[in-house]
Amino acid sequence: MTRYFVDTNCLLGLTFINDRWYPDAKRLFDTDNTIYTGKNAVYEYCSSTGDNSRCSADIRLDRDEGLYGEKRAKLRLKLRQFGKMLQTYSDDELDIETVMDVYVDRFDMKESEEKEVRPRLQKYFEWYFEKEGELTRRTAREAARKLKDVLMERSIKHKDQIEARVYLEPMRDREYPDVEKRLKEWPVHMKNNADIALICDAVFLKEEIGISHFVTGDFTDIYSNQDWIHENLGFSVLYLLETFAGEEKPTAGLDLDD
């Protein structure tokens, strides 16, 4: 069975069903392979606060801070704003494209994110308005409220699944100054200390339990240096959106039935 190391984006991608990485992260986590992560990914994911550091934090997957807590707070705020913004339109002005444009605007989506997320969200709204038989200010407001409830509930459920599915042990207990030095020098020139820390976590797990793949959800220095990492550190780097891409099933909106 293959042993994967996943970064923070993979964890967030599975947690939030409106995340651009959700379909691909779900396919990864639905495999029979063993999935590991490291203390630095979990620090970012759910253990960082304004008062702790990577060295001082109590790093556990059952905590609710970090990017997980921040994204949940943002969801609550942005979806409330979304619902209120829809109420500024008359019933005659509302159509599915207008609803989606307001959502994209409220969430400040980048073009790349919009391309991934908008079609899935549009399926949800189309399903909801068809179920209600009309698209009005009332049904738009109710659809926004339902979406908020679903996203919040699923984020809790999926985080529980991550706690049960992902191994944080063994946790790195030593430093890799030589690896850090080589990553910062030519030809890699890696500048992001958080990425370097993630790689060192993966090096540790390569030594301890033989992880073979590092899965990342973003085009970072890690992915752009995949050949060097494979040749020198002994594990391959996989890009989540390429390796686990697939046909999305038609859905009543963001896996409402999962």
Predicted regions and their residues:
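Active-site-proximal, substrate-binding regions of enzyme catalytic domains
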Residues: 2-207, 220-258
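Acidic beta-strand-to-loop metal/phosphate-binding motif
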Residues: 211-218
